[in-house]
């Protein structure tokens, strides 16, 4: 049984763009580097050749990984979701009960999670604590520094 990979339409598009970049730009550039390095003669001691081959291996591995994730993607259009209950795709505004600091997180698939962009994986401890909860509820999450409590201030679908 093939395990589906949940992701937003934005996450799917980002993976598609990376795949196109790697296939149509990076792959030909690397092949060119290999050909150029090969022309320098003895391959056994040709560091440039070995570096280009290693780069090719890395690129081809990532292409295979991207193709696999895209093939197994379960794309969820977040804009068509609604409701007060937090689930995949929700954008949640939290208030730290200790510091009163507001943070906004969107719950996304593992492949598109990026804390710097405010996107957390559905498998993260925070997302798992939020799933199924509603606005106004308080959740407690085990963090590296101990338990943290957050009030759910807002649930949006965007």
Curated annotation (Swiss-Prot):
This protein's UniProt keywords: Coiled coil, DNA-binding, Transcription, Transcription regulation
InterPro entries: GreA/GreB_C_sf, TF_GreA/GreB_CS, Tscrpt_elong_fac_GreA, Tscrpt_elong_fac_GreA/B, Tscrpt_elong_fac_GreA/B_C, Tscrpt_elong_fac_GreA/B_fam, Tscrpt_elong_fac_GreA/B_N, Tscrpt_elong_fac_GreA/B_N_sf
Coiled-coil stretches noted in the UniProt entry, renumbered to this chain: 47-74
Superkingdom assignment: Bacteria
GO molecular function, one term: DNA binding
Gene3D superfamilies: Transcription elongation factor, GreA/GreB, C-terminal domain, Transcription elongation factor, GreA/GreB, N-terminal domain
GO biological process: DNA-templated transcription elongation; regulation of DNA-templated transcription elongation
SUPFAM superfamilies documented for this protein: FKBP-like, GreA transcript cleavage protein, N-terminal domain
Sequence similarity: Belongs to the GreA/GreB family.
Its biological purpose: Necessary for efficient RNA polymerase transcription elongation past template-encoded arresting sites. The arresting sites in DNA have the property of trapping a certain fraction of elongating RNA polymerases that pass through, resulting in locked ternary complexes. Cleavage of the nascent transcript by cleavage factors such as GreA or GreB allows the resumption of elongation from the new 3'terminus. GreA releases sequences of 2 to 3 nucleotides.
Protein name per UniProt: Transcription elongation factor GreA
Source organism per UniProt: Bradyrhizobium sp. (strain BTAi1 / ATCC BAA-1182)
Lineage of producing organism: Bacteria, Pseudomonadati, Pseudomonadota, Alphaproteobacteria, Hyphomicrobiales
């Amino acid at each position: 049984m093939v395990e589906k990979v949940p992701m937003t339409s934005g996450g799917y598009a980002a993976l598609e763009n990376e795949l196109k970049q790697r296939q149509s730009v990076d792959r030909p550039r690397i092949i060119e580097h290999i050909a150029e390095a090969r022309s320098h003669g003895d391959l056994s001691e040709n560091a440039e050749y070995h570096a280009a081959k290693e780069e090719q291996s890395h690129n081809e591995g990532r292409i295979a990984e991207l193709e696999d994730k895209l093939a197994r993607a379960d794309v969820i259009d977040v804009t068509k979701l609604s409701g007060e209950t937090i689930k995949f795709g929700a954008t949640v505004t939290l208030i730290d009960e200790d510091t009163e600091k507001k943070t906004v997180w969107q719950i996304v698939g593992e492949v598109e999670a990026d804390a710097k962009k405010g996107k957390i994986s559905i498998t993260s401890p925070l997302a798992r604590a939020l799933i199924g909860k509603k606005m106004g509820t308080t959740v407690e999450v085990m963090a590296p520094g101990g338990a943290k409590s957050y009030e759910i201030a807002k649930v949006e679908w965007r």
